[in-house]
């Protein structure tokens, strides 16, 4: 099993960053030809998801709609003032698994891997575990 940790610097309070290239680079560097790539976000106010990366309007729509579902101000009880970030992260999720074949991530032509920031800007970690098999 190979492991790497990526450092991600976000520049906005809410942001989706396409990290597909960095994840593929980790897979390539592992020399694993067939297996599973697990992506884990060790934060409670950030997430990871797979979505379309061909049209930037998809990211804009995603961000707009999740902000409607979970508004920043809504009478939350959590005293740190970032309850919405915790809720969004739990809804989107902290991990993804992607099949590796021939040393490449098996993804649809329009799919990309997105790091989702919900309480930025911050420096974040993305843990990538690559399992051969």
Regions found by a protein language model. Give the residues of each.
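Active-site histidine-anchored catalytic micro-motif
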Residues: 1-133
């Amino acid at each position: 099993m190979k492991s790497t940790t990526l450092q991600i610097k976000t520049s906005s309070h809410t942001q989706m960053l396409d990290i597909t290239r960095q994840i593929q680079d980790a897979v390539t560097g592992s020399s694993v030809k067939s297996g599973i790539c697990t992506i884990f976000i060790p934060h409670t106010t950030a997430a990871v998801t797979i979505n379309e990366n061909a049209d930037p309007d998809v990211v804009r729509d995603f961000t707009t709609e999740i902000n409607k579902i979970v508004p920043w101000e809504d009478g939350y009880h959590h005293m740190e003032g970032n309850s919405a970030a915790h809720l969004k992260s739990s809804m989107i999720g902290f991990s993804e698994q992607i099949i590796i074949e021939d040393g490449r991530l098996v993804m649809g032509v329009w799919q990309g891997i997105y790091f989702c920031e919900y309480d930025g800007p911050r420096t974040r970690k993305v843990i990538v575990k690559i399992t051969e098999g």
